[in-house]
Amino acid sequence: PADLIAKEKEIAEAKAVELEAIQKSMEALEDRKTNIRVGYVYVISNIGAFGERMVKIGMTRRLEPLDRVRELGDASVPFRYDVHALIFSRDAVSLETRLHQKFVEQRVNFVNNRREFFYVTPAEVKIALEEIHNEANDLTGDVLSFDEWAEAEEFRISESQRKLQNV
């Protein structure tokens, strides 16, 4: 009986932890539903498709922000995108807007502002993020990752193979 009680107590504690995680997930979903400004700002590049001086600065409200990046790179470009920055913000809309404003003169498409490509490097975006953080650190939220280097694995392997074939 003591072993049975201990086992039941262990199961109950595990269920309590599981229930707490579910409640937190539900709270996060409710927060997103009531606050449409919450989300992730991402900075991505595709040097194989666009060269080394072009990034896309976008925003997503998805719980899994990398799903959006994968979706962008699925069929419309020859290589996968590299993620340079992923920033969670309680006001991702304003953060994205501020970044776009910082690079308004480097915008690739002046006709359609929904095309969020800019002639800048990831390093320049990092500097802009630091400036925005100093001006209004509540916008920048949590920088989950930042990497200035574009791995561009598929592109680099393809270029190496192309050079070998042309020898």
Task: Identify the residue ranges that each predicted region occupies.
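Non-catalytic accessory segments flanking enzymatic or RNA/DNA-binding domains
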Residues: P1-V167
